[in-house]
Amino acid sequence: MLKIFNTATSKKEIFKPIKNKKINLYVCGVTVYDFCHIGHARTFVVFDMIVRYLRLIGFQVKYIRNITDIDDKIILKSLKEKIDISAFTNIMIKEMNKDFSLLGISPPDEEPRVTNYIIDIIKVIEKLIKNKNAYVNDHGDVIFSINSDKFYGTLSRQSLDKLISGTRISIDKEKKNSSDFILWKKSKKEEKFSWNSPWGKGRPGWHIECTAITNVFFKDYIDIHGGGSDLLFPHHENEISQSRCLNKNFRVKFWMHSGLVIIKNQKMSKSLGNSFFLKDVLEKYEAEVLRFFFLSTHYRHPIYYTEENLKKSEMSLEYLYVTLYGTKPIFDPIEGVNFEIDFFEALNDDFNTPQAFSILFKLARKINYLKKIDLSKSNFFAFRLQKLAGYLGFLLNTSQYFLQKKLPFDEEIIKKIESLIEKRNFARKSKLWKEADKLRDKLIKLNVILEDLPEKTLWRFKR
């Protein structure tokens, strides 16, 4: 029985979709004004894992993740780079997809770009004005009135006064309330990036985009709405308020939020100048290591981004690959099934990946024990380990590929190593221990790690 922590109620609840086994799932996507950073990676690895698991246990998931391809930062960046805005956003989206693909993040079922839904956004704004939830100010901007929604502030579970004091909200004399927000921003005369509307040329505000897109794809309900915890207020609060005012029958059953990335005891933020581009991190660490790192912490908790923690993840993942090294995974319906039961129990408890990881490492210890006494039996458990880890999106490569990747390959050195191992094995069988030790020392100098099993000796380069 799957339980999910619901931000709206601040508790774990048994998950039941609104309609049978079909799930409407929406995650706020990237504003493509620059390369993706590790905060993006954390959020989308988490929701990739969640979607994979929901499908694994039998749900039909309709997964939508938007792309914001128009806003002030995008306009400024394209002008700075002296490149057409659509060409610029296409480049950024291509880079985003490349990074996400390396991390094993499967694409959503639909990835709507905001600029393709301007007409839908205008229709939504027109209805909000008609319902007296929005007004046009003297500048010609369309503004949402938070006072028109008596439930405003309930999602983030704070009083409006606290929400205002705890958030950077600009005070504008053109607003009836300082925390009212823009739905449609009227363009200045010199601005090129605008669309015609009943209120003159302009472009949409950020919050209205998700409301309009979810209205197109989901109409009356979303089973799971996700995003980073930094979006809870004001973005998600504003979004759900707009959606309620647009459609009184609209509901989100579960709100899910992933934790922040912490760097040197501060949340990662471009405004603080402490963010890391994902592409730069991927030059130093393999994508599988980074995915492992993100899932090693519970999705709701903050994750501490340090070189030490990345190295720990690299070593942990290497341990699992070393465990599989030398095995030939074979399915058995009985062996290791208890590990699988425990693994599913962990993920059914609000996607508890740290607990699921602990099951994988228990399984690895079992395999390493069996490799020394019954290699053929270890193959059954190796199959189970590979299968369960695969559900989370790792251990998808061969051990040989992972362990030797990025290491120099020289055919002559390989031949020399295998010759030394053969001589050492002969010396051991002949009980020529001193000779065997000398040969082992030569192999160590060649950066070789040996693993002696009853039937054979495995070797690999030290990474």
Curated annotation (Swiss-Prot):
Keywords: Aminoacyl-tRNA synthetase, ATP-binding, Cytoplasm, Ligase, Metal-binding, Nucleotide-binding, Protein biosynthesis, Zinc. Pfam families: CysS_C, DALR_2, tRNA-synt_1e. It comes from the Bacteria. It is an enzyme of class 6 (ligase). A motif ('HIGH' region) lies at residues 30-40. Its EC number is 6.1.1.16. It catalyses: tRNA(Cys) + L-cysteine + ATP = L-cysteinyl-tRNA(Cys) + AMP + diphosphate. A motif ('KMSKS' region) lies at residues 267-271. One of its GO terms (cellular component) is cytosol. ATP binds at residue 270. GO terms for biological process: cysteinyl-tRNA aminoacylation. The keyword Nucleotide-binding applies. Binds 1 zinc ion per subunit. Belongs to the class-I aminoacyl-tRNA synthetase family. This is Cysteine--tRNA ligase. The lineage of its organism: Bacteria, Pseudomonadati, Pseudomonadota, Gammaproteobacteria, Enterobacterales.
